[in-house]
């Protein structure tokens, strides 16, 4: 995932439990290890995907295997990542098996979303504007099985959840004030959807 200035890229490595940072050499197009080349995660966390705050110096990594999100302070000049917080993506009472998949920050920079495969939900978090840390808003069922991916369309009005094992893409309206998701009733059949791209 490139940072908003397209200077650095963060690469989560699930197998090594680490987040690697590279700098883009614009003269050659090559990726070069950043000054702080990697940050270790907790053993067994399984970092999967990263997302940057659009305007503030924060990055968020969703950890697949322990169903958490790590909040980082991000140094846009050197590409450094400093861990600030780890928060679960699952409700306290949930005891089943679940892994995470996708993460996204709203275009407003006010909310973070993460998908849970097993709990089959989207976890919703509010971002503290002063510190970047997350607080849980709630969870919304994806109305399907195994939400491998989701995407927020460019205006930030709608979120689309791709349920891989129920062959559906479900549309939600994003409440701009609370970050909560409201099902629109629109469900599209699609064979094992695993990604959504807006062009």
What are these regions (language model features)?
Residues 1-25:
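Intrinsically disordered, low-complexity linker/loop segments enriched in Gly/Pro
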Residues 1-8, 41-58, 89-109, 143-158, ...:
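Beta-rich, blade/repeat-based domains predominating
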Residues 3, 11-14, 53, 61-64, ...:
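Conserved beta-strand positions in repeat-built beta-propeller and related beta-rich domains
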Residues 14, 24, 64-65, 74, ...:
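Short loop/turn segments immediately following the C-termini of beta-strands
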Residues 22-31, 72-80, 124-133, 173-180:
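Short loop/turn segments immediately following beta-strands, especially the blade-tip
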Residues 31-39, 81-89, 133-141, 181-189:
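Beta-propeller fold detector
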Residues 123-173:
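C-terminal hydrophobic structural anchor segments
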Residues 164-173, 177, 182-199:
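Blade-level signature of beta-propeller repeat domains, shared across WD40, Kelch, NHL, RCC1
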